[in-house]
Amino acid sequence: DDIWQGLKFVELNRRKAAKRWTDLLEAGLYQRLEEFWPQAYEIIGDILIVKLEDEVVSHQREIAVAMLEKHPSVRLVCADNGVHGEFRVRNLTPIISRDGDISTLTKIREGGKLILIDPTKAYYSARLSNERLGNLTSAKKLAKILDRPISVCDPYAGVGPAMASIISSPNLVDYALIGDLNPDAVSLLEQNITNFTRKLDTKIVIKLLCQDARLWKKTHDYLAKIDLLLVNLPHDTVNHIPELLPLMSKNTRSLIRGWAIINRDQ
């Protein structure tokens, strides 16, 4: 065809897409340490977190480069060193960044909402997303029963994933008492709450606290106001609920949703 005359033709060999990140490692290296390569990893926003066995730590850069190539949406690969501190936050070591940015601040999307999170500063678990969806369903049912917007309390809110869909739903909530004991979590929570409510036409009264929730009963303005109480503190839920009951509304239908881990011998 005349239209192609004068153009240079280049024949390209099509590279078969890797099914696993390990397919991108040098074959000899992979085979030599085959039993030690990480089989699982976690992606939070644009951060990939992987736990490395001692036998492959010296090859962490090769691992991270392969993972970046396998996951184009990942910006940063970090080694997982477990959790630490009073608030059990992630101890992460950045290995490699796609663009040079090694910040562990990222965003995740849940329930259609973007949530700002830093796993090195505040706890977050994607595994509880179904439970949080159940919170929204329960909140809507309770509002329908009461025939009015409800008041909500989340005393162990972290960065606010449980509030994302509830507080952003039009005409569902008119009062929210929210907090956490971790000041870093509350700082992120404040930013997230602002984003969750930005497009609402109705005003919500929001009290945001960085304090042990068991002390909230000592503040008169917080008493007998809450229709829906969320208790996401699995190891201490049973012990904390009695301290939170004074916050609950009286003489109307109310609801407590929480999770508890209880030993079989209890």
Label every PLM stretch briefly.
Residues 1-266:
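SAM-dependent transferase fold signal centered on methyltransferase-like domains
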